[in-house]
Amino acid sequence: MTATAPVITVDGPSGAGKGTLCKALAESLGWRLLDSGAIYRVLALAALHHQVDITSEEALVPLAAHLDVRFIAQDGKLQVILEGEDVSNEIRTETVGNTASQAAAFPRVREALLRRQRAFREAPGLIADGRDMGTVVFPDAPVKIFLDASSEERAHRRMLQLQEKGFNVNFERLLAEIKERDDRDRNRPIAPLVPASDALVLDSTSMSIDEVIQRALTYAHEVLALPQQ
């Protein structure tokens, strides 16, 4: 059952709309959801909760291998559940972010989390949100989507998000940060940010989120022959 459960992977750069699309797909299809971008933060928080030495690869590996985490999409929002507790806000703190960066530096921790991510593949299906879901984590996924947008559009979206939260932000600075991250992600030696050869590439620059969701759903139904709802 686990090996044959279908997977829809959604990869792409930050700000392209992956999270919104994946939540909508998971809710529409009633499938499980994996937010790979949050998983290192969840591991970091678990390490802090259990007072595990974050500088010890030996100590982190078993925690990563048995990480008790679920991602729930509901009403367009993502809930991150660690050991039965909603930690959606807690994983976004600076302390957790710094700890996550340390944990991600260990090869054996990365390998343990790779196996843990693959274990999310269960019936009726999985929506996998990330940067290397279709190329590394689920290379055999029947539906692969690469969601992109211009760096200017992504910076604009990020600026609006931050302004809604009351932050005063500089567009040019945001744009420079996004371009720098893009360059780093696309040129890294391990798992660079590139579309899988068999991925549907969607450029959301001039598309509404509803258009993106409908295009992705139509494609998934075509490939998987899913029953129309």
UniProtKB/Swiss-Prot annotation:
Belongs to the cytidylate kinase family. Type 1 subfamily. The keyword Kinase applies. This is Cytidylate kinase. HAMAP family: Cytidyl_kinase_type1. GO terms for molecular function: ATP binding; CMP kinase activity; dCMP kinase activity. The keyword Coiled coil does not apply. It is found in: Cytoplasm. ATP binds at G12, P13, S14, G15, A16, G17, K18, G19, T20. GO terms for biological process: nucleobase-containing small molecule interconversion; pyrimidine nucleotide metabolic process. It comes from Serratia proteamaculans (strain 568). GO terms for cellular component: cytosol.
